[in-house]
Amino acid sequence: HSIHRIARQMSDVFTGERVRVSSPQGRFTDGAALLDGHVIAGAYAHGKHLFVTFDNELTLNVHLGIYGNWTFGGDETFTGASSIGAPRKIGEKEYAAGEEQPYASPPEPKSTVRCRIVSEHGWADLVGPTICRVLTPEEVRTVRSKLGPDPLNSDADPERFYRAARKSGRPIGVILMDQAAISGVGNIFRAESLYRQEIDPLRPGKSLSDDELKRLWEDNKHLLVIGVRVGRIITTEPEDRPGVPETEAWPDHANYVYMHHGEPCRRCGTTIRVEEIAGRKLYWCPGCQK
């Protein structure tokens, strides 16, 4: 969900702006030179990939990975999130630009900044990405063709996810993290959607009914939409956090099972379990998810 927030932020503050693009770190110098001085046409997300399009038909493609993040700043016309991405634990701080100090020019970049984008009214710095590259239109199509459908995109076809699950003997908890099967579902959404739909994460994908697969798709879409709107991953229903509004749920009342191992389930009282599967920690309730 955070990549869709970044795409929205990029579109809001940079679309139609002629920008300077540089690489203070030096690792993206050649790519930055291809984009420097051009106008940003827009930005969109597909799963965990960000695509920023320019008027010369080239596209900046970024994947934050685990440690990457974008930082934004500017004058009173340049509003939005100050930092989006890792570190995940502190969430995102969002406030009107200029709240901290008047904008005159971007601050001196840190030596770790892979890519800096500067317009007349503000700037964006990228640090620690897994991917930062420039693509042609054909290369963009190739990258996107390898990605599964993104529930947040209006043109997403869930059938690709359904087919991937139906023919697989892998646990559904692993399939949900496979970006070639479904894009944008991270570790928290994986655990929480399976809990909410009362599905054992260790069940083979091919054992799930059409109804169960559809419910998983729709619930992940629902939770991702909330994530984009609120800026944090809130998966609990109001009745399971009485008196705690959605905007105040994070972190203590935000999730059912994620990071709650060893604690009693909110709904049935069974102890929440955690197990490492495919290199990531998977949380679930053995009582609710059978």
How should each PLM-predicted stretch be described?
Residues 1-290:
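Structured catalytic/nucleic-acid-binding cores of DNA maintenance enzymes
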